[in-house]
Amino acid sequence: FLKKIDESELIEINNSIKNIYQDILISENIEDNVKSSILKYLLRLIESIDQYAITGSEAIIEVLENTVGHMYFNHEYKEFMSNTETGKNLLSKMGEVAKKVTCFTGILELANKGFELIENIKDFNN
């Protein structure tokens, strides 16, 4: 299910993620704890792209999963990613990256459905 990415696509993806990183780093409109989480995941993504020749797509997928999965554990992070233009753009970019490295589509849609299911289970148990 993993695809091989050519060098030009890797460079394009990496530059795009680095630009997002810089934009978030200088932003004054993001809470420090949320900014810290986002920057941490973006650095991991940049590193996994840099090491693609060694690790392949698997490391990139792992970072994407962790980035989206963190939304379940941190409410402020989830709110930022779900309800701000910057967060939505970041999720969209991560979806683009996921499509380039896998044959799967709709990873973010599946993640959102998973979050809804988890919330429904939590509500049901309360």
What do these predicted regions represent?
Residues 74-126:
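Membrane-inserting effector segments that mediate pore formation, membrane fusion
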Residues 2-81:
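Membrane-active, amphipathic/fusogenic segments and juxtamembrane/transmembrane anchors
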